[in-house]
């Protein structure tokens, strides 16, 4: 059945509309997330960066001098300027050079009203001092733009999400009696990184046997415990690739464990019922309450001590969240990771997780929405 992807103006058009509404002539954003979001440039171990966007949407990217050539190749910016001098790690205050170079950009130097948002502490204030002008805080609009993903962002999230499932397969294959948790953890990282063909960002809970009741890091971190026959193995794997993130959780088994296998099946049913609640206008608070009720009624003596899920995109943990206090309504274009789990103290835990795209017609698992493969 064809999926109708959410349609909204591109994030640059939404940003330009905000600028017009407030009489802003240009906006300057600092930091890798902001830069990636607005001009598609992200680089492993990249230096401090910033982007200038004017009222017609022209984008000027500022990166370290030696990084300028690759930035011209990879970014969507109309112009790339390199700041500072040649070399790496020589200047201990590169932001000073970044700010100075931005202050010389024509639209910044000559503009009347500038908005700024910064992921680099203090860079916004330093720019204001350099240009001798008052700036408008653009943090709220940048946050709101990130909530709704454009189609190009969905594909970037999908790429990282698929890496998560390749890593999960490695966990499933490696969950054999005698294998150490850290060996399985490392196999997951290696599998995903080789598939990506570049360094990735990798976070993971990897717990086996009775350790699974400890839920997650930092309570239990993958170590030298040897997996035993019949052990459940819980893996929550989060991967960032090219600056966008995917998330997954699965409960694997070293052989057979009928009791926890049944628990996993029940959690998958709760995951599906939760998916059906991810509709425009719904809230994370409503979804969490129902998930918690289902977990506690299905598993007497079990608990759900963590959130029910969260959005993701440029980070692995974004608004909105499936928690009791989040009343932000869901909107088409939001991408949410949903992760029901249950934990029996001293015995075992289990968790499953998929990523969903909210559409006008409800939520669709991200791989299905974009025509990829199914679970696992």
State the predicted function of each range.
Residues 1-376:
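Active-site neighborhoods and metal-handling regions in enzymes and metal-associated proteins
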């Amino acid at each position: 059945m064809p999926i109708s992807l959410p349609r909204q103006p591109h994030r640059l058009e939404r940003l330009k509309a905000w600028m017009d509404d407030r009489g802003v002539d240009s906006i300057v954003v600092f930091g890798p997330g902001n830069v990636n979001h607005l001009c598609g440039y992200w680089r492993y171990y990249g230096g401090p960066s910033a982007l200038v966007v004017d009222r017609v949407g022209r984008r000027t990217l500022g990166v370290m001098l030696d990084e300028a050539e690759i930035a011209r190749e990879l970014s969507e910016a109309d112009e790339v300027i390199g700041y500072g001098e040649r070399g790496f790690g020589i200047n201990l205050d590169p932001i000073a050079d970044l700010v100075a170079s931005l202050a010389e950009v024509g639209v910044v130097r000559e503009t009347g009203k500038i908005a700024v948002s910064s992921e680099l502490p203090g860079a916004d204030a330093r720019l204001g001092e350099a240009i001798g002008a008052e700036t408008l805080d653009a943090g709220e609009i940048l946050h709101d733009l990130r909530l709704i993903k454009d189609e190009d962002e969905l594909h970037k999230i999908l790429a990282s999400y698929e890496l998560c499932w390749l890593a999960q397969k490695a966990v499933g294959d490696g969950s054999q009696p005698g294998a150490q948790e850290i060996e399985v953890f490392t196999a997951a990282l290696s599998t995903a990184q080789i598939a990506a063909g570049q360094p990735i960002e990798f976070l993971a809970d990897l717990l086996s046997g009775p350790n699974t009741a400890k839920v997650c890091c930092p309570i239990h971190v993958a170590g030298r415990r040897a997996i035993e026959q019949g052990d459940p193995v819980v893996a929550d794997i989060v991967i960032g690739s090219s600056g966008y993130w995917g998330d997954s959780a699965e409960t694997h088994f070293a052989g057979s464990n009928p009791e926890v296998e049944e628990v996993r099946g029940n959690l998958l049913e709760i995951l599906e019922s939760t998916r059906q609640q991810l509709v425009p206008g719904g809230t994370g608070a409503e979804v969490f309450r129902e998930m918690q009720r289902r977990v506690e009624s299905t598993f007497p003596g079990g608990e759900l001590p963590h959130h029910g899920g969260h959005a993701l995109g440029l980070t692995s943990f974004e608004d909105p969240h499936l928690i009791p206090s989040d009343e932000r309504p869901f909107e088409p274009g939001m991408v949410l990771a949903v992760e029901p789990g249950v934990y029996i103290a001293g015995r075992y835990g289990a968790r499953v997780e998929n990523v969903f795209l909210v559409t006008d017609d409800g939520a669709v698992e991200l791989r299905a929405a974009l025509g990829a493969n199914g679970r696992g």
